[in-house]
């Protein structure tokens, strides 16, 4: 997870710019600001940003200091899962579970990227571990610790943290020590702690006057609670209402077709699906063999814990109709790895005594190999021989397991060794290849994907583009069984990254602002482009003492400029450029006070729609937050009004040195604004 960690550069520049701001300004860190100007906040909880900011303060902000905490989170998740499984199922299952999680492609991906998901997964695993400790000790403090971990996860990625909550509650109520009334009371007490930790920071933000804090990024009413339960809540599941549908991720069409087989879809399967059949068998078998165990049996309890967690995540991820990214599946990677390990170890032990268990093991290995064969086929040209090796190994393992029940003891030993080696290849051959491939190329933007270039969808690596779909129906196998669809080689429409983004400095990444790109979004993905060095040099040399280097529309434009220059940049409108902050009055005040000389228009996605609100004037206040207005939808757009004011009052500049004209990166224009203009 740590090897070649900086290959992705600043990765998602939306979070990178916020982390850079947090590393330089305690105020920006506390308010979870999206940049050094502090007009708009991130659209997620503050914890991941704080982690990156603290690391930057200690090590100096860089790609390494930003991504190192993510890698540490990934390693700790593996370690904690190992201890959780060891306490309940023994050392062998623990080692297998840790290995499977470490080789799960989506886990490797998020552990090397600056999205909040690595920290989220760590806190969810830690909460599950604390519940196991509560079952062991019977002490309330472990239950409270579990609630604290979930609350911290809520401060990382809001309601997604609660995917683990049903599993924690059900497990303690079913298998916890003591009478039911006592268990209910303790669960209620933990719930109170959970609520307090979850909403402590968000509640504090809402007590601060809107004029003295950043505007809540991607909200429609400048409310953290509206963002939590709207755009990042109901609309993520229903696909309707609650926000603009963008935020730190882009669009709703990135995650395949909703339905029970969504996680096997061509666009998602390579991230998480490898072990799903084995995990399902492991859950069913584990509960069956422990059907007569005492209520407090830890072995059954951990199956309930991991099973409810995985099933809850499967249901939400499979049927959510709002914005979806394949890396969201990292939230269920730990329970899937744990259940798959439990199934493997349990079936191997049971197969020695019962023929029907041997048959179940053989079938599970065959199914796992067949799925890996299909998933590997989604990456044309990627070690094409491996899929046949995996399929052959699965068949060999299945035959060896079945033959072991009818041959003599001497031959059985040799078959057992052959079955073990073949089973290992069948189970981990595919995901480990995808995991290793993830280490080998950089990615950028808001929708990274694990695996080799050309698998699934999106773009990654220099000058390359991922495929939107790979052949699902034409080659048979799991394509037909698990609903895998789409013509081979079909690419997404030109509307930004189809997935993984581009490596910094690649042809695809040189699209905003400047470089040699042909315009924003062809492969770089939102939050993944590099700043034009010529533009940055011009702004630096013509800053003339201004507090802010430039104001730019949307974080995908402003973020790279701030990262390249290290100077405060105003992100007009937040992530998509649609947030009503700063207001026109605030922008005018900044120009009048000499705190801002240049504005870069274009590149955001507010269009002509935008969102009204956020009136008032803060002049050059560092945390204008829209001037206290509550935002909301309106007939007039603040983003359009900002653009109209700039084009009316400021002078277009060609920073390449030609005569004044509406010049700049493709689709963008740089304007010079002076105090006399205001």
Where are these regions (language model features)?
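Sec/Tat-exported extracytoplasmic proteins
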Residues: 23-27, 232, 268, 440, ...
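C-terminal region of N-terminal signal peptides and the immediate post-cleavage residues
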Residues: 3-14, 115, 119, 202-215, ...
């Amino acid at each position: 997870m740590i090897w070649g960690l900086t290959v992705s550069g600043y990765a998602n520049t939306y979070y990178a710019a916020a982390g850079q701001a947090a590393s330089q300004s305690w105020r920006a860190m506390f308010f979870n600001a999206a940049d050094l100007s502090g007009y708009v906040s991130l659209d997620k909880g503050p914890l991941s940003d704080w982690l990156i900011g603290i690391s930057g303060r200690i090590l100096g902000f860089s790609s390494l200091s930003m991504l190192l905490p993510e890698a540490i989170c990934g390693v700790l998740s593996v370690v904690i899962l190992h201890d959780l499984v060891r306490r309940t199922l023994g050392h062998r299952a623990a080692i297998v579970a840790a290995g499977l999680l470490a080789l799960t492609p989506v886990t490797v991906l998020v552990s090397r990227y600056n999205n909040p998901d690595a920290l989220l997964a760590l806190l969810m695993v830690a909460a599950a571990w604390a519940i196991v400790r509560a079952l062991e000790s019977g002490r309330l403090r472990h239950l409270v610790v579990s609630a604290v971990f979930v609350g911290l996860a809520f401060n990382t990625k809001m309601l997604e943290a609660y995917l683990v909550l049903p599993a924690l509650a059900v497990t303690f109520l079913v298998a916890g020590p003591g009478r039911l009334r006592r268990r209910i009371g303790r669960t209620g007490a933990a719930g109170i702690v959970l609520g307090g930790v979850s909403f402590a920071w968000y509640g504090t933000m809402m007590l601060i006057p809107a004029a003295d804090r950043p505007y809540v990024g991607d909200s429609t009413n400048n409310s953290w609670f509206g963002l939590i339960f709207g755009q990042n809540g109901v609309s993520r599941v229903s696909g309707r209402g609650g926000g603009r549908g963008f935020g730190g991720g882009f669009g709703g069409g990135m995650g395949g077709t909703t339905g029970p087989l969504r996680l096997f879809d061509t666009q998602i399967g390579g991230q998480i699906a490898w072990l799903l059949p084995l995990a399902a068998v492991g859950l069913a078998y584990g509960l069956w063999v422990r059907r007569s165990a005492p209520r407090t049996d830890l072995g059954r309890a951990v199956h309930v814990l991991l099973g409810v967690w995985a099933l809850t995540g499967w249901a939400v991820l499979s049927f959510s109709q709002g914005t979806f990214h394949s890396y969201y599946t990292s939230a269920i990677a730990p329970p899937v790895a744990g259940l798959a390990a439990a199934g493997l170890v349990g079936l191997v032990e049971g197969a020695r005594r019962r023929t029907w268990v041997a048959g179940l093991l053989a079938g599970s290995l065959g199914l796992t190999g067949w799925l890996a064969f299909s998933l590997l086929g989604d990456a044309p040209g990627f070690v094409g021989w491996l899929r046949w090796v995996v399929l052959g190994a699965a068949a060999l393992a299945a035959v060896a397991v079945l033959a072991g029940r009818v041959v003599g003891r001497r031959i059985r030993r040799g078959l057992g060794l052959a079955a073990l080696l073949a089973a290992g290849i069948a189970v981990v051959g595919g995901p480990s290849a995808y995991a290793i491939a993830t280490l080998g190329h950089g990615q950028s933007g808001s929708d990274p994907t694990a695996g080799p270039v050309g698998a699934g969808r999106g773009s990654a690596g220099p000058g390359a583009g991922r495929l939107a779909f790979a052949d699902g129906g034409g080659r048979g196998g799991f394509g037909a069984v698990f609903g895998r669809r789409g013509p081979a080689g079909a690419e997404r429409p030109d509307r930004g990254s189809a997935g993984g983004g581009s490596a910094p400095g690649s042809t695809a990444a040189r699209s905003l602002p400047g470089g040699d790109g042909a315009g924003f979004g062809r492969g770089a993905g939102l939050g993944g482009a590099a700043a034009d060095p010529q533009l940055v040099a011009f702004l630096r040399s013509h800053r003339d003492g201004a507090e802010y280097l430039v104001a730019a529309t949307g974080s995908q434009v402003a973020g790279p400029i701030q990262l390249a220059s290290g100077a405060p940049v105003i992100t007009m409108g937040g992530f998509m450029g649609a947030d009503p902050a700063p207001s026109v009055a605030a922008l005018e005040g900044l120009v009048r006070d000499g705190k801002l000389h240049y504005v870069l228009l274009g590149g955001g996605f507010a269009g002509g729609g935008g969102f009204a609100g956020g009136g008032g004037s803060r002049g050059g206040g560092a945390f204008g937050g829209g001037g206290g207005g509550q935002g909301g939808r309106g007939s007039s757009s603040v983003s359009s009004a900002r653009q109209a004011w700039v084009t009316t009052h400021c002078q277009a500049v060609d920073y390449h040195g030609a005569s004044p004209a509406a010049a700049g990166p493709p689709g963008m224009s740089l304007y010079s604004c002076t105090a006399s203009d205001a």
